[in-house]
Amino acid sequence: MKIIAKKDLFINDEIRVREVRLVGLEGEQLGIKPLSEAQSLADAANVDLVLIQPQAVPPVAKLMDYGKFKFEYQKKQKEQRKKQSVVTVKEVRLSPVIDKGDFETKLRNGRKFLEKGNKVKVSIRFKGRMITHKEIGAKVLADFAEATQDIAIIEQRAKMDGRQMFMQLAPISDKK
C-alpha cells in the first residue's frame, strides 16, 4: 500500500463518495458497501474509515486506527532516513611543486577520508606561470591516484577548470 501523506487521504467525514470497496481491520475484503454502512462499521469497531485508493472504481476504503497508522508510517520513514548513507566530498588541495613530505601528509588525509567512505576531490591550483606546466600537475595527480588505487577508484579523470586541475576519487566499496 503506497500512502504518502495526509493530504492524499480522506478520513471519516471527509469521504465524499456513495459507495466504497471496504477492507477490514485485518486486511480482509468486506465487499462493496454504501458509505453510510462503512462508516457505521467503523464507528462500531471504534476505528477510522480511511479512503486509501480514491482513483479505483469503486474507491477503496479501509478500517484502521489512523493515529496508529500515521505513527507507524512516520517511524518507518525515520528509520529509512537513518539507513541512508550521506556521501560527502572532501577536498585535498595540492600544488604542482609539492614537496615529498607534504605530499605524503595530504595523501594520508585523503586515504583517511576514503576509508571513512567519503569521496575525495584532489585539486591542484596553478599560480602565476605554473599554468604553462600542466604536465607537472597531471603527474602529481597521477601519483596520488596510484598511491590510493588499493582503496579507491578514479570517478572523474584529471581535467582542467580555469587555473585548477582536479580529479575525483571514490572508495572501492561504493562501486561493488
From Swiss-Prot:
GO terms for molecular function: ribosome binding; translation initiation factor activity. It comes from the Bacteria. It is found in: Cytoplasm. The keyword Protein biosynthesis applies. Disulfide bonds: none annotated. GO terms for biological process: ribosome disassembly. The keyword Cytoplasm applies. Keywords: Cytoplasm, Initiation factor, Protein biosynthesis. GO terms for cellular component: cytosol; membrane. Belongs to the IF-3 family. Monomer. IF-3 binds to the 30S ribosomal subunit and shifts the equilibrium between 70S ribosomes and their 50S and 30S subunits in favor of the free subunits, thus enhancing the availability of 30S subunits on which protein synthesis initiation begins. This is Translation initiation factor IF-3. It comes from Streptococcus equi subsp. zooepidemicus (strain MGCS10565).
